[in-house]
């Protein structure tokens, strides 16, 4: 167009959005896919927005960060619970395995102070009691 207004007719655009042929080949990706996560960033962002006071603004990177932390902690707990299930020679993770995994790890134990339903209790026998039982066994063996 004469006068320098509008798009130039020289073939190259002066900026802005790309032409239709280049944009059509790109497939839309979610925030989770871009960050390489399995957990949904959009849902976490929505929960963050809903649960803040006075409907504060939440940045996209904050939601991705919180999602990554949640995914990491979940993977850590599931790995330890899977190992506990494998040690007991079963193929299904139960609340008992989750309890053993969380209470067996010092850092997770301090982080997760909740009571796990149907988790049971950790097996623990006081050392003083163990010594008495062992001494009785030795005494019986010497007498017999």
From Swiss-Prot:
Main location: nucleus
Pfam family, one: Histone_H2A_C
Keyword field: Acetylation, Activator, Chromatin regulator, Chromosome, DNA-binding, Nucleosome core, Nucleus, Transcription, Transcription regulation
Modified positions (N6-acetyllysine) in chain numbering: 5, 12
Keyword Ligase applies: no
Family membership noted in the UniProt record: Belongs to the histone H2A family.
Post-translational modification: Acetylated once deposited into chromatin.
GO molecular function, one term: DNA binding
Region feature (Disordered): 1-36
Species whose genome carries this gene: Gibberella zeae (strain ATCC MYA-4620 / CBS 123657 / FGSC 9075 / NRRL 31084 / PH-1)
CDD domains for the chain: HFD_H2A
PANTHER family: HISTONE H2A
Protein name per the record: Histone H2A.Z
């Amino acid at each position: 167009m004469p006068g320098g207004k509008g798009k130039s007719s020289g073939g190259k655009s002066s900026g802005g959005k790309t032409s239709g042929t280049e944009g059509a080949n790109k497939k839309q990706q979610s925030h989770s896919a871009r960050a390489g996560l399995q957990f949904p960033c959009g849902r976490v962002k929505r929960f963050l927005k809903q649960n803040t006071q006075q409907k504060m603004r939440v940045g996209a990177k904050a939601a991705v960060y919180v999602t990554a932390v949640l995914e990491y902690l979940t993977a850590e707990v599931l790995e330890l619970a899977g190992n506990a299930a494998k040690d007991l020679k079963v193929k299904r993770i139960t609340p008992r395995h989750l309890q053993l995994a969380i209470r067996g790890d010092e850092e997770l134990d301090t982080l997760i102070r909740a009571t796990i339903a149907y988790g049971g209790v950790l097996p623990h026998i006081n050392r003083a009691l163990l010594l008495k039982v062992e001494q009785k066994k030795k005494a019986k063996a010497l007498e017999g």
